[in-house]
Amino acid sequence: MSYRELAWRVTARELESSLEEEKGEGERPVAHLLSPFGARMNRVLIAGTLSPPEPVGRDDPPTFWRSRFTDPTGSIPVTAGGFQPRAMAQLRTIAVPRPSVIVGKVHLYRGRDSVAYISVRAETIRAVAEAEERAVLADIVRHSLDRLDLLERVEKEPGVSDDTLAAAGAPGPWIVAARAALHRYPT
């Protein structure tokens, strides 16, 4: 049985700083982007402002669209195409910079020069009022701070068990992500 991975609440800055990737195995491997802030992301939830989109490619009508997503910490490209028809339709209708909440898959591409390019392929896009955008951003920051607290504890207490961390309220995926982040981003 397949399941959808949880969408990690992250900022543009956290996405921009996530340069380590874990690739799964098997017939349909799942890739995860590891954040130095303690997230192991396949899907993300982001909140900020989307710029008006532009078509990519030469198809007529366009089958792939790109926009720029900006939050108080930075900006990241957001895309949608034929495999995400609802998100593509939602993205195409944005006429002016608009506060939005987006759920999508994170994608890391390394160019020939080995420079990392990170984008989010939107699954859903929802235009929101500024008050809702601020509330979602506050929730994202709370999650980031809680994950950083967990990272600090795992770093200071390397022998602490997953059961002890879970009993203290840390969600299982956060524990796995914290350990992976400390392994990939040693301090």
What do these predicted ranges mean?
Residues T49, K105-V106:
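Short, surface-exposed secondary-structure boundary micro-motifs
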Residues S35, P55-P61, Q90-R92:
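Short histidine-centered beta-strand/loop micro-motifs
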Residues P55-Q84, T124-V128:
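OB-fold (S1/OB) nucleic-acid-binding surfaces
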Residues M41-P61:
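Structural detector for short beta-strands of small beta-barrel domains
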Residues P85-R86, R92-P99, V103-K105, G111-T187:
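Extended, charge-rich, solvent-exposed interface segments
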Residues I46, W65-S67, I102, I118:
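Hydrophobic residues positioned within well-ordered beta-strands of beta-sheet architectures
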Residues M1-R40:
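OB/S1-fold single-stranded nucleic-acid-binding modules
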